[in-house]
Amino acid sequence: MAVCIVVCMIVGYLFGCIQTGYIVGRVNKIDIRDYGSGNSGTTNTLRTLGKTAAIITFLGDAVKGLVGVNLARYVIMPAFHVEGEAYLWLLTGFAVVLGHNFPFYLGFKGGKGIATTGGVIFAFHWQLGLVCAAVFLICLLYTSDAADEL
């Protein structure tokens, strides 16, 4: 069981280290971290590269949260004959967000983890994920400077 926990955490962290904003920036021949706020998240991508790049970044970061947890749930845990341990899903989700926020290969400077956390929530309970997404969008539209860019 301890080995399964360690494997879930390591795989989750490494999966989270995939920086969609950084990759989108590189495709556009820039280092996104050299612009705006200096992080590789969706908002900085929106302000630097526009809506299409931001949507790709947001979806990529959210999907890695969703896939990271489900990878532990449906691949890693069954390989270790571990069933129904929801706390392992939570630990894996936490590791994915940590990997997103603090990727080792970018000097431990990544995004803020909003989209990735949303993906983790969707992995646990998709209905709750929809409610959280609706609340987030309402708050974003009414309180954020980023809403002006949408």
Residue ranges of model-derived segments:
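Interfacial segments of multi-pass membrane proteins
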Residues: 46-51, 72-76, 113-141
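Nucleotide and nucleotide-moiety/phosphate-recognizing core
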Residues: 4, 53-57, 63-105, 127-128, ...
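Conserved small/polar residues in nucleotide/adenosyl-binding loops
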Residues: 142-150
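Helix-boundary and loop/linker segments of multi-pass membrane transporters
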Residues: 43-47, 81-83, 109
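Cytosolic, membrane-interface loops and tails of multi-pass inner-membrane proteins
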Residues: 22-52
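Alpha-helical transmembrane segments in multi-pass membrane proteins
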Residues: 8, 12, 17, 21, ...
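Short, non-helical or kinked segments that cap or interrupt transmembrane helices
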Residues: 31-42, 105-118, 145
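Feature marks short, highly hydrophobic, charge-poor N-terminal signal-anchor/signal peptide-like helices
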Residues: 1-7
